[in-house]
Amino acid sequence: MNITIIAVGKLKEKYLKAAVEEYSKRLSRYCRLNIIEVQDEKTPDNASSSEQDIIKEKEGRRILKYINDNMYVVALDLKGSMMGSEEFSKFVGNLGLSGKSNIAFIIGGSLGISSEILKRADYKLCFSKMTFPHQLFRIMLLEQIYRGFRIMKGEPYHK
């Protein structure tokens, strides 16, 4: 299985980079992982709704450059469907069983994901109704993917 994470913004803090490296190493037993960072746009203070949409569209165009036709695209979005870890494990496993072995998870910037990306998405997933920093969320996603593979394989970890 090939898993691509396309995220807006770069990780700058060493502790976040270390966590990403650790989960990337752990996941190498289960899948080929590719993490792509696209440049984020600066959001001016008090940006209007239309300015925010323009920023999301610019970031969205950068993301689209990395999405192939054969990818099953999962957009991480507050309006998406929620599921628990075991359900997420089945979701990823079933994608692989149905021949969808190239999965792309999209993490938007601080303003969210563009409408163009949401239209392209095959599935919209919500981890929580809470908002998280997108840099931290990348680690949360990696951990859930790792947890999902452990559950799939019947290996201890998830309790």
UniProtKB/Swiss-Prot annotation:
The keyword Ubl conjugation does not apply. S-adenosyl-L-methionine binds at L76, G108, F127, S128, K129, M130, T131, F132. The keyword S-adenosyl-L-methionine applies. Its main location: cytoplasm. It is an enzyme of class 2 (transferase). One of its GO terms (cellular component) is cytoplasm. It catalyses: pseudouridine(1915) in 23S rRNA + S-adenosyl-L-methionine = N(3)-methylpseudouridine(1915) in 23S rRNA + S-adenosyl-L-homocysteine + H(+). Its EC number is 2.1.1.177. One of its GO terms (molecular function) is rRNA (pseudouridine-N3-)-methyltransferase activity. It is found in: Cytoplasm. Specifically methylates the pseudouridine at position 1915 (m3Psi1915) in 23S rRNA. Homodimer. Belongs to the RNA methyltransferase RlmH family. This is Ribosomal RNA large subunit methyltransferase H. It comes from Clostridium kluyveri (strain ATCC 8527 / DSM 555 / NBRC 12016 / NCIMB 10680 / K1).
